[in-house]
Amino acid sequence: MKILHTTPAQDGFYMPAEFAPHEGCLMIWPERADSWQYGAYAARKAFLRVIETISESESMTVLCSEGQYDNARAQLPDRVRLVVMETDDAWARDVGPTFVINGRGERRGIDWGFNAWGGDVDGLYPSWEKDNRVARKFCDLVSNDVYDKRDFICEGGSIHSDGEGTALVTEACLLSAGRNPDLTKTQIEQVLCDYMGVSKVIWLPRGIYNDETNEHVDNVCAFTAPGEVVLAWTDDETDPQYALSKASLDALEAATDAKGRRIKVHKLPLPKPVTITAEECDGLDLCDGEPTRTPGERLAASYVNFYIANEAVVMPAFGDPMDEKAQAILQELFPTRKVVAIAARDILIGGGNIHCVTQQIPKI
């Protein structure tokens, strides 16, 4: 593995869309006691369903701590590769490398800086050194050269690419005080163009209400095809999410992509508000002496937090009447893939969902 100090755009590399073919997927075995209630037992069951579904059509690598290796190996399908690598938590989307390709059979990774979604300003845990090493270590594991961009804080969940020159981000996240406060919006956009290999960045104002990542784009909006997106939506104007989704809709309707196309927006309904119970809170350890959740707190539940595998779309379900409607919409948008709904409340309690715990490895 070489550590590169050029940029992907300079070298003819770009971030492909998630709906492009994959070689595989990266996930991390959940363990952290202040993220995953009651010893992560229920979370692991949900992770296993995600792993089993994705690994039917692409290779799967799972990282785990040395202490969890035997337990994880006993539960994971034999086809899944299990690797000991220390992490601070299980958010593969945000700590794993962002992979870029050149269309000529080469793939490289990007090692962004990671500071637990806000560092000393509003980060979610006090120490993130292990997480900040994952991207580079994983690139070494798969023998891919890596671009060093640790001086720029960026998580995989905060960026989407259509593979044809357009990126999708939120202002709430990318311009947050805890990430790159010394850079202007224009400078941040240039970094995205240089490293994602895009020529157009569509900025959505906001994400999902109460999303503690400062409103990652992957929870509110995602490309389903070039020039097409799904947008998390509610018709309830009294819900605080309505104004956030409406602002994003306005931005999308005013935008064109890198190829000059208007964006076709498919509204994906939200479930009714999901809140955490006192019993669930009691199952979480304190973080730095403070509780990580309070009973009744609204969680950032959204069907947009799905993963596009080679032969499946793996979406979260919440035991809500909207589960079936969201699944039907996604099935219409992805006719060549099977849309699989997985009960994901136990992932949501940790702070994210299915897209947040997965990271695709594009095929070359």
What residues fall within each predicted segment?
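Histidine/cysteine-enriched polar flanking segments
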Residues: 1-364
